[in-house]
Amino acid sequence: MRSVAVAMEQPLHGPPGLSTILARTDWAEPWLLGLAGFHVLCFLLTCFSFQHYRVQIGHFLCMVCLVYCAEYINELAAMNWRLFSKYQYFDSRGMFISLVFSAPLLVNTIIIVVNWVYRTLNVMTELKTLQQRIKAEKDKKK
């Protein structure tokens, strides 16, 4: 725990990379555990909503709105980080919030879009098969 505190206090030389941010983050902080739980719930809802289009569309739109608002959330968190965190993770570039908040939400939205494309291709294939079957039946009648 002491090494995390020392690492967080060291000045950065240039923009931090992914490995630097991951190494300097105290993953045992309650708010980060809560955020991880939120992402697990979002992923489960993504998986369970495949058969319910309206739920999936609402879930998709909520996640897109959250990603859109990430900059504002980052600014708010940067001003009030002492209320919920031991360290100031929220920089002006938004690298931390992009990694721990936006990236998992975007992965979920990509899963949903891939599912939509897959289903659309299946419907198009079924439609073309049906059209060919109807055409073949018409040709038989002639």
Swiss-Prot record:
The chain crosses the membrane at residues 30-50, 57-77, 94-114. Residues 115-142 are annotated as: DNA-binding. Residues 120-142 form a coiled coil. One of its GO terms (cellular component) is nuclear membrane. The keyword Metal-binding does not apply. It is a multi-pass membrane protein. It comes from the Eukaryota. One of its GO terms (molecular function) is DNA binding. Residues 1-29, 78-93 are perinuclear space. Residues 51-56, 115-142 are nuclear. The keyword Nucleus applies. Keywords: Coiled coil, DNA-binding, Membrane, Nucleus, Transmembrane, Transmembrane helix. It is found in: Nucleus membrane. Belongs to the TMEM18 family. This is Transmembrane protein 18. The gene is TMEM18.
